[in-house]
């Protein structure tokens, strides 16, 4: 066999190995076995003497992008260990796209900080596809340059684990809102201490909170550019609503309520059996769907309402009022609702009066109805209107603010 045939066979073996490494799952412990295979290719092609005395030609070596892809399958600490294999491998791990960084893996917080500063150096241009970051209760100001690096390297998936006493750093919230390609955000809530998690993003496709207590408060605002519900979008909303169905306190904006209404036209809403408190903003045109939504909250105790003041809600015609009239009475009004509050000042418009009438006439458990009047409204005139409404509850107190 001449030298040309040997070379051809070696290159074929290298390409075959490269293909198998890309498409086949594998587990690696300790030293990266791809490095060993790289040496074996040459050893199998030439005699042992040649292998010992001849430097491996570049054409027999696996390319750096493939080696980096291999390192992406390793735990970060194992990928770092490959830096001792040779001079060539010394910095390869710095180009991995998937990273797991936990302060508990380091001997001290300073060691953790030093490593992060080194890896997230602003001059490095490699992309970060996925990052799992475990934080402790130290001052989080050190995260700012790291966050800048995340945005610069177009991070797509972020998993944050917060230990007891550690609050979500404000810089991470800025990352969510400023990173144009972030698609997945997961937060492990190890310890609930009344913390608030606010997420605002145009690119986020997945937001996961784990180990969250059922009495956590949810404030959700979801918007879609088009009210077109294909199978994928319907499935996503279904999973989201099912996931939050155990919360006890929820805030919903008008757009989110409209979204839920459109969803409920084709799929039955889940039961929010644990929810006792609801803060909701409504548009007058959506009032007729409100009782349908309340049917899914059978144990609601406290309700705070905000009516959106749009041109259409100010000028509802008698026919429009009839179309949005509310007839059905959900279970919560009959058995659990005790407190209703109109958060925005009311001035006697048809949608507002219709809701006031609805709660007073249909809820035997209602204890307090709180109303705010606009300055030009007189209390006496409004009281006269209220007196004409039959009350289902003999204990209901109407409060004017």
From Swiss-Prot:
LRR repeats lie at residues 128-152, 275-296. Pfam families: F-box, FBD. PROSITE patterns: FBOX. The keyword Repeat applies. InterPro entries: F-box-like_dom_sf (IPR036047), F-box_AtFBL13-like (IPR053781), F-box_dom (IPR001810), FBD (IPR006566), FBL13/AtMIF1-like (IPR050232). Residues 56-102 form the F-box domain. The keyword Repeat applies. Residues 321-373 form the FBD domain. Keywords: Leucine-rich repeat, Repeat. This is Putative F-box/FBD/LRR-repeat protein At3g23955. The lineage of its organism: Eukaryota, Viridiplantae, Streptophyta, Embryophyta, Tracheophyta.
């Amino acid at each position: 066999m001449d030298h040309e045939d040997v070379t051809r066979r070696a290159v074929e073996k290298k390409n075959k190995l490269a293909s198998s490494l890309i498409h086949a799952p594998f587990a690696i412990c300790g030293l990266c076995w791809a490095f060993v295979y790289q040496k074996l290719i040459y050893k199998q092609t030439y005699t042992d003497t040649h292998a010992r005395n001849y430097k491996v030609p570049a054409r027999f070596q696996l390319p750096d992008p493939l080696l980096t892809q291999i390192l992406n399958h390793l735990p970060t600490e194992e990928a770092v260990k490959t830096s001792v294999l040779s001079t060539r491998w010394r910095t390869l791990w710095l180009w991995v796209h998937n990273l797991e960084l936990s302060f508990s893996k380091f001997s001290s917080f300073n060691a953790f900080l030093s490593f992060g500063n080194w890896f997230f150096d602003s001059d490095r241009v490699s992309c970060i596809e996925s990052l799992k970051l475990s934080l402790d209760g130290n001052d989080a100001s050190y995260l700012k340059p790291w966050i800048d690096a995340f945005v610069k390297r177009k991070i797509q998936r972020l998993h944050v684990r917060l230990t007891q006493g550690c609050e979500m750093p404000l810089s991470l919230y800025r990352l969510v809102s400023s990173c144009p390609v972030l698609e997945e955000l997961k937060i492990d809530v190890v310890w609930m201490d009344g913390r608030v998690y606010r997420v605002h993003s145009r690119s986020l496709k997945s937001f996961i909170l784990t180990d969250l207590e059922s009495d956590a408060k949810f404030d959700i605002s979801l918007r879609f550019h088009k009210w077109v519900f294909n199978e994928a979008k319907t499935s996503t909303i279904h999973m989201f609503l099912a996931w939050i169905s155990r919360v006890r306190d929820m805030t919903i904006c008008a757009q989110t309520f409209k979204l839920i209404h459109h969803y409920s036209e084709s799929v039955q809403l889940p039961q929010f059996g644990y929810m006792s408190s609801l803060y909701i903003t409504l548009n007058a045109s959506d009032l007729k769907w409100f009782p349908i939504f309340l049917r899914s909250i059978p144990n609601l105790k406290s309700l705070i309402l905000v009516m959106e003041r749009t041109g259409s809600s100010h000028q509802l015609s008698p026919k429009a009022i009839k179309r949005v009239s509310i007839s059905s009475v959900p279970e919560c009004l009959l058995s659990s609702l005790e407190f209703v509050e109109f958060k925005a000042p009311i001035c006697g418009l048809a949608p507002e009066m219709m809701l006031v009438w609805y709660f007073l006439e249909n809820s035997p458990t209602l204890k307090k109805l709180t109303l705010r009047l606009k300055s030009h409204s007189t209390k006496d005139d409004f009281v006269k209107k209220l007196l004409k409404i039959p009350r289902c509850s003999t204990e209901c107190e109407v409060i004017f603010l």
